[in-house]
Amino acid sequence: MLTNDSMNENLNELKRVFSSLTGKEYFKNLDVGLVDLFRYLRDEIKDEKVVIALDEFQYLMQLNRGVLSIFQKIWDGILADTKVFLIICGSSCVSKHGRFRDW
């Protein structure tokens, strides 16, 4: 689950989760951003089926307005040819006009 603490805290949590998922401790010590973190994950999981669920995604959108573009890059450029199922969900959604709406 994502939080509204900081992008760095969320990134560290993803590193911890990816370390647990792959059994590779080095994830916790990586000094990389989201895009490169997902590259490392792709390289470790190879052809495995993996489900990644990012709940409360609206917190990332509040912390970084460009995070949707970052995840589009991750999906199109890194995860497109993998067996990763990426689920992005939360209690709010951004409309075309940038306002949050409750569903």
Curated annotation (Swiss-Prot):
Q: Which SUPFAM superfamilies match?
A: P-loop containing nucleoside triphosphate hydrolases
Source domain of life is Archaea
Query: Could you tell me what this protein is called?
Result: Uncharacterized protein MJ0424
Query: What is the source species?
Result: Methanocaldococcus jannaschii (strain ATCC 43067 / DSM 2661 / JAL-1 / JCM 10045 / NBRC 100440) (Methanococcus jannaschii)
